[in-house]
Amino acid sequence: ALSLGGQQWNNLSVVSAPSLNGTKIEAQGREVNATLLMRNHAPWLANIKYLYYNPGVAKTHASSPTPTSPLASANTISFRGWPDLQLRCEECWLWGQKYGRIDGDFAIKGNTLTLANGLIDTGFARLKANGEWVNAPGNERTSLKGSLHGSNLDTAAGFFGISTPIQNASFNVDYDLHWRNPPWQPEEATLNGILRTRLGKGEFTDLSSGHAGQLLRLLSFDALLRKLRFDFRDTFSEGFYFDSIHSTAWIKDGVLHTDDTL
């Protein structure tokens, strides 16, 4: 087994061969099945059929511990010599979590790394992203813009082990965010941007206690319309049904504001 990047790569075979305009590297093993085309005058292309990367799991000697993340020494990262890269991963597992399909086109210009056509598709939700990371000493900043959507919010959240009181609702979120620091270390006090959220028909659960849930079920405009359609689900249940929710929120220096949630 090969120890690299904080992980043991088992039954690994790596083959390198010249190609028409560069070099082709094929890697196959228990944790990876991938091909890398190192093209001479074009972005490198990484086609990954399967990747399981979980750094920190491999056992190491106490005197030489392995960092749990390759980003632990992020303050030393330099883009000098980095190639532009087109990433296509059909099935990716990262830090023990299945993410599914991951795509992205990465370009380097000076101290700036740009992401275009970013995509994470778990099968339950699709996250699209474009952005940039400026890695200038003393002026490091990140910006991301894109969308997140899926047909069922609680199923999409449950895929990552997260529970939500919103059930059976489709969701669409458009985001435009920026902050100081690298992408994986957002500084809360410098987080700014806009979130636009749209939820389809669904239900709030766990509203059975107190009078607030009863009042919502009785006076909600959506609930009144459903009663006109002879739909009395929320009258006899403990949840609160809604036909849609729309919200625009803006973040200023880490504080979320909204005044139009409907």
Q: What function would you assign to each model-found segment?
A:
Residues 156-158:
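Extended non-catalytic domains of envelope/secretory-pathway proteins
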Residues 1-32, 63-147, 168-262:
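Solvent-exposed beta-strand/coil patches in large extracellular/periplasmic or lumenal scaffold regions
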Residues 162:
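Cytosolic ligand/metal-binding cores
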Residues 35-50, 185-187:
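Flexible beta-edge/linker motif
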Residues 52-63:
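Soluble, acidic/polar mature domains that operate outside membranes
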Residues 149-153:
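Short connector loops/turns at beta-strand edges and beta->alpha or beta->beta junctions
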